């Protein structure tokens, strides 16, 4: 009888926490050692949306010496959101809690397989999905209840290989830090690549092949805070992007929001926002320098098609509504919590009847 009463009390506590938004939402974040990273910003934006709406998010990191995102994203993300390290300690996870785990933390899934919490894998980079899984392992076999991804193309890919896990799309939002400049662009070209060797090769090849443009400056966008990144981008007249593994493509959209045209290598999975008239998209990265040269000539002659700028603006407008992003995050979590509460209530009814 005492055990039954104890079980009833535990289930009722879970129901109350879910109904009152007190159930914890653990969001795992990668330590970028102070370097800006769009994938990490996305998770923090989710956390802040939940916190603002009265939910109970907790940002989880691996080590006690976590550098954090204060210097590049904003100190408010460190002070307003609770943080917890898992080094040398276990998470206090209750059945009503939610764990949101980026795909790069897949190695943790076997460790939390038997936890009663609701587990979600957050997939922004499809190339990392299988990296930490053993042959034959799937998300469903490791207790994952849901996947969140950023594009319909990635959803299609995930649906094919993780068939028993429902996938929901939550497109990133481009920060309002990125705005069109008030002054004319300078002779600077922004470069953003996944592999830094591509940046080095691009710049050296360009200067060798087109020495007449040595007066132009290339700016490697690596290692900047969000404010520095946005400020630098506003000064540029062109952006160059190389990232074969990109699942979404944040940098081109940030460039478009600043009114900066983009020349880019089409990734292995082409982003759904990419069209032939909102940028210059090519299949062979070795020819990018030639397209850059052609663009420079057109820019110097004031001969860039105005339609490109119009298409850029309409493209990025679809990813600029922060309110809609915040509402989508909260709606998703709220729906999960409502269903969980209903499930616990059914469980409570059965325990009571027995």
Map each language-model feature to its residues.
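A charged, aromatic-enriched C-terminal amphipathic alpha-helix characteristic of glycosyltransferases
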Residues: 300-353
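Aromatic "clamp/platform" in nucleotide-sugar-dependent glycosyltransferases that forms part
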Residues: 244
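Conserved catalytic-core segment of nucleotide-activated headgroup transferases in glycan assembly
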Residues: 39-42, 46, 156-229
């Amino acid at each position: 009888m005492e055990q039954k009463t104890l079980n009833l009390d535990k289930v009722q506590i879970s129901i109350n926490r879910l109904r009152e938004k007190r159930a914890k939402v653990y969001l795992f974040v990668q330590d970028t050692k102070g370097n800006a990273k769009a994938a990490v910003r996305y998770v923090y934006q989710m956390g802040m949306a939940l916190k603002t709406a009265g939910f109970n998010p907790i940002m989880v990191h691996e080590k006690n010496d976590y550098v954090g995102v204060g210097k590049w994203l904003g100190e408010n993300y460190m002070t307003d959101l609770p943080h917890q390290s898992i080094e040398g300690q276990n998470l206090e996870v209750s059945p009503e809690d939610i764990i949101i785990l980026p795909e790069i933390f897949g190695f943790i899934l076997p460790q939390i397989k038997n936890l009663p919490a609701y587990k979600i894998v957050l997939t922004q980079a499809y190339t990392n999905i299988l990296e930490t899984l053993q042959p034959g392992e799937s998300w469903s076999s490791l207790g994952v209840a849901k996947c969140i991804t950023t594009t319909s193309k990635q959803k299609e890919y995930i649906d094919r290989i993780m068939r028993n896990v429902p996938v929901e799309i939550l497109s990133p939002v481009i920060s309002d830090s990125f705005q069109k400049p008030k002054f004319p662009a300078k002779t600077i070209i922004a470069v953003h690549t996944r592999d830094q060797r591509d940046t080095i090769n691009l710049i050296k090849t360009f200067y060798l092949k087109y020495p007449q443009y040595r007066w132009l400056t290339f700016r490697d966008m690596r290692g900047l805070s969000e404010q520095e990144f946005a400020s630098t981008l506003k000064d540029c007249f062109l952006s160059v992007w190389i990232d074969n593994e990109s699942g979404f493509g944040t940098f081109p959209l940030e460039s478009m929001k600043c009114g900066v045209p983009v020349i880019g290598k089409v990734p292995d999975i082409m982003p759904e926002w990419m069209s032939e008239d909102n940028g210059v998209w090519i299949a062979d990265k070795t020819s990018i320098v030639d397209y850059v040269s052609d663009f420079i000539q057109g820019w110097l002659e004031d001969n860039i098609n105005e339609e490109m700028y119009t298409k850029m603006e309409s493209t990025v407008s679809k990813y600029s509504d922060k309110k809609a992003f915040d509402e989508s995050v909260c709606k998703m979590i709220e729906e999960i919590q409502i269903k969980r509460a209903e499930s616990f209530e059914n469980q409570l009814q059965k325990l009571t009847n027995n």
